[in-house]
């Protein structure tokens, strides 16, 4: 006959074993950033990345991160772990991951080649995670000031519901009709 102690030990062991199976959490790469397998693998030419995304019927988003950023980790472990959110983003966006203090060379829309850190400074990126969203076409972007090239920006962590709403806001081009706050108010 099973004892209470035996049942408790079994339950604990089963829970512990199940935890190992479910532990498909992303882990940081060599650069200290969490990576999603579906993130855009790029030559870091923003014009080409935007053109490629548009050719595939998608929009371009840049995710700025920083090693050790707790809210970047939260974005990966909570927001991107939600199958519905991840699926919507994969189906509608190309997400380019950049490091706020990184040294990789990136070619901006105006053909200026900068380190990730210099590009972040040019666009006034100060918080991580920050998502930048760009128009469906690169036409005319090089003539605009850096920040004016964006159609939307999400500075800082957004809870999953608002996170998905921000991507919907951009995909549906709701920025042409009003602010993100207006979009949230009208879409629950």
List PLM regions with ranges.
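Thiol-based oxidoreductase modules, predominantly thioredoxin-like and allied folds used
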Residues: 86-114
